[in-house]
């Protein structure tokens, strides 16, 4: 049976996963697709929120990342920040007008 391959991650997703602020900044300055997704529909902002990377999340939003973009489970970056108890990042996303009423597929 043939093996299914996972699509490669974009450089932006990799930079954010690794918490690499400098490379993330360089990619954004060079016009990378800011709303690129991984295999689960997570954007770079979802990943930053899930890891508590407030500086990277701020940078992504300054470059126009979609704050309420849902992934395949309808979760937004705010869901990830709140679920992981990243209080400062959760508050920042709320201050940036993230939809606090957004519902994912589990609630």
Swiss-Prot record:
It comes from Rickettsia prowazekii (strain Madrid E). This is Putative ankyrin repeat protein RP714. SUPFAM superfamilies: Ankyrin repeat. Keywords: ANK repeat, Repeat. ANK repeats lie at residues 7-36, 40-69, 73-102. Gene3D superfamilies: Ankyrin repeat-containing domain (1.25.40.20). InterPro entries: Ankyrin_rpt (IPR002110), Ankyrin_rpt-contain_sf (IPR036770). Pfam families: Ank_2 (PF12796).
